[in-house]
């Protein structure tokens, strides 16, 4: 691409944007009856970094059950082997007698329940989780706070991830609990989730953190901040509300009762992870000033908030319900992640939180990054998405030559597709309409889109053929010119 041409084209159309499997044995099934699934999480000695997990499994009528620790967390496409942090596993019956168990594979504990002839039993499981890795993908516990990403803490009963669960959090005196989970009415502090997916998609911050709150469009929004930084509380609430409003304008409302932003402010950390009705953001203490730093933080916030729709609801069919034991492959992360980068920037501009000059500067930087990556000539956006499990989170010295970043390429594809749709429809349609179509026809029905139908969605919205575009730029490696 030529810089002068790109700058001119970006400037010309910017105004229009603002308008708008078990390896050893076949596991036993736990499906014969609806189980009672209750977790209790304690941390009586937080300085040890050890979470104490009690898992009560009632109405068990199978002679064996498999308890599985996830090997990865949704939104972060790498096998993280959370079972490595589990210690002191034990299983007991109703009389506190030990039950026999064995490891069936690296992440599965097989328990002999003692149930015979279909007689229902209750199994009590206890284990510890070591949590001293501060990232958005893991859990962290020390004397100052507790943060948990559920996939790294809670085992599940194989075959029962679709059943309701409850969670009790025993927090130290003086520590508040901020979580997207809802309290069960009259339950004496038990939180509830309709299934395991929602439980582990609800990151939780416990401690003496700041808690900022604002209402927007009748919905409560909370910002839990752990750590000290150069932020202005009133400005944060105001700017977050502007981002929320742009999402609501684009999709015609907010698909939640309440939303939680968890913000960790510490030296040496950064990044974000999307969740169903929340996000975790990590940043440095100086991320809120000067303006260049603050724009970076707002871009992160906007990107993760846009995931509320794009990937948490508008998702490839393969990304939910999740298989927590194996890789979940998709060729569409360029859309789920890269296009969220594109809209993260665009929502800030539409909200007035980024100037036209800042928008163009950021966009040109993405173009330069892409053009300086030789791997663009050998790896497609689809291939980068599919190989995220072995490439995306494991860069080495040869990565720039052999691979591309699906965030970066997907960001540019979002821009190109938006431009193509606007051009082919005389400005009557845009990428916004594609996202709304995916939301209305898939997300709101609670299903993922088949990836083979994605091109057809663009064609339906634009009334034009996108075969050549997808062949060259999505599944192919043609140079963008």
Regions found by a protein language model. Give the residues of each.
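Positively charged n-region of N-terminal signal peptides that target proteins for export
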Residues: 1-4
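Boundary at the C-terminal end of the N-terminal hydrophobic targeting segment
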Residues: 19-25, 32
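Juxtacatalytic substrate-recognition/specificity segment
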Residues: 210-333, 339
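Acidic/His/Gly-enriched intrinsically disordered linker/tail segments
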Residues: 314-322, 327-408, 424, 442-445
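Beta/coil-rich, acidic/histidine-enriched accessory regions frequently appended to metallopeptidases
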Residues: 26-28, 441-481
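Bacterial N-terminal signal peptides
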Residues: 7-19
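Non-catalytic architectural context of zinc metalloproteases
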Residues: 31, 44, 74, 79-88, ...
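Early extracytoplasmic/domain-onset interaction patches
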Residues: 28-72
């Amino acid at each position: 691409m030529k810089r002068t041409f790109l700058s001119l084209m970006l400037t010309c159309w910017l105004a229009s944007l603002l308008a708008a499997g078990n390896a050893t044995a076949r596991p036993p099934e736990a499906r014969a009856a609806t189980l009672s699934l209750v977790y209790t999480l304690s941390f009586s000695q937080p300085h040890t970094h050890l979470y104490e997990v009690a898992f009560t499994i009632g109405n068990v009528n199978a002679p064996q059950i498999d308890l599985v620790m996830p090997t990865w967390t949704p939104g972060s496409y790498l096998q993280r082997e959370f079972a490595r942090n589990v210690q002191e596993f034990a299983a007991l019956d109703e009389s506190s007698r030990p039950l026999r168990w064995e490891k069936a594979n690296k992440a599965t504990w097989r328990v002999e329940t003692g149930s015979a002839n279909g007689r229902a039993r209750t199994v009590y499981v206890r284990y510890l989780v070591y949590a001293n890795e501060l990232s958005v993908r893991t859990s962290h516990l020390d004397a100052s706070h507790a943060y948990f990403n559920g996939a790294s803490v809670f085992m599940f009963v194989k075959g029962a991830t679709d059943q309701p669960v409850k969670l009790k959090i025993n927090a130290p005196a003086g520590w508040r609990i901020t979580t997207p989970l809802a309290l069960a009415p009259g339950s004496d502090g038990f939180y509830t989730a309709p299934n395991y997916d929602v439980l582990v998609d609800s990151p939780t911050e416990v401690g003496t953190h700041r808690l900022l709150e604002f209402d927007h469009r009748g919905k409560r929004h909370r910002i839990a901040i752990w750590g000290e930084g150069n932020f202005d509380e009133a400005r944060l609430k105001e700017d977050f509300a502007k981002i929320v409003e742009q999402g609501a304008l684009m999709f015609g409302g907010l698909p939640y009762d309440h939303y939680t932003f968890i913000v960790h402010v510490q030296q040496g950390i950064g990044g974000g992870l999307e969740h169903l009705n929340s996000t975790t953001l990590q940043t440095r203490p100086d991320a809120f000033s000067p303006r260049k730093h603050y724009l970076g933080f707002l871009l992160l916030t906007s990107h993760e908030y846009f995931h509320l729709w794009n990937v948490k609801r508008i998702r490839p069919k393969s990304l939910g319900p999740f298989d927590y034991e194996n890789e979940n492959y998709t060729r569409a992360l360029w859309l789920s992640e890269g296009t969220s980068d594109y809209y993260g920037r665009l929502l800030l501009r539409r909200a007035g939180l980024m100037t036209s000059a800042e928008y163009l500067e950021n966009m040109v930087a993405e173009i330069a990054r892409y053009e300086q990556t030789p791997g663009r000539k050998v790896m497609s956006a689809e291939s980068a998405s599919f190989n995220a499990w072995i490439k995306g989170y494991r860069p080495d010295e040869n990565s720039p030559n052999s691979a591309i970043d699906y965030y970066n390429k997907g960001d540019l594809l979002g821009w190109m597709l938006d431009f193509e749709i606007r051009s082919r429809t005389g400005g009557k349609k845009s990428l916004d309409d594609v996202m709304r179509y995916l939301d209305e026809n898939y997300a709101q029905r609670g299903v993922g889109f088949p990836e083979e139908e994605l091109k057809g969605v663009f064609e339906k919205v634009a009334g034009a053929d996108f075969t050549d575009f997808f062949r060259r730029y999505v599944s192919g490696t043609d140079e963008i010119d």
